[in-house]
Amino acid sequence: AAPAAKAVASGECEKGIVLCTTGIGVSISANKVDGIRCALLSDVWSAKMTRLHNDTNVMALGAGVVGENLALEIADTWLGTEFSGDERHQRRIDKLMALEK
């Protein structure tokens, strides 16, 4: 997870997807990298909302938790949803990013 998160944080790529059996370990690992907002996802609605409201740049999936078809639907939704740009959502992100300092 760390190499993917570092690639996103450095600007080498825009977004990253990380997987392990539960998704928990990779999400914790990715979130240790400054500039990363990783969400562990197991449903389509959360995939959409985490992009709209939190501008997540890494998503984690548990391969032993979600089946292949659902995982693909979650990834498609997450990749296809843009950040809302709403001021209240940006303030929330700014507060989260300030915790890294």
What is the predicted role of each segment?
Residues 44-101:
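C-terminal binding/interaction regions
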Residues 4, 26-29, 75:
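Buried hydrophobic packing segments
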Residues 18-64:
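Mid-chain, well-packed structural core segment of small domains
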Residues 1-15:
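Short alpha-helical segments enriched in small residues
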